[in-house]
Amino acid sequence: MHEIRKTEEFKVWLDSLKDLIGRAKIQARIKRLAEGNQGNTKSVGSKVFEMKIDFGPGYRIYYTKHESVMYLLLIGGDKSTQNKDIQQAKHLAKNI
């Protein structure tokens, strides 16, 4: 099992989701990441990865890897905020 840590920004985003089914799907996806299944993931640069959840508005989780065993969930968003979220995730990753 890989260790998963969450930034405050990520926690606030996840807790603010009104879509309870979407939130449950995101939490299930995080569990699969902890089990080593990265799934539908791509690099967006600066050691930041985008994990796509094919549900609702197209949820995304932005994360970075540390020491090859721990994932730090930086921020979440959806397709409509993708560009802004990527920039914020890169900024957060750079400053940890």
Tell what function each PLM region has:
Residues 3-4, 12, 23, 38, ...:
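Enriched for short, Lys/Arg-rich terminal
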Residues 28-55:
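A short, surface-exposed loop/turn module that caps and links secondary-structure elements
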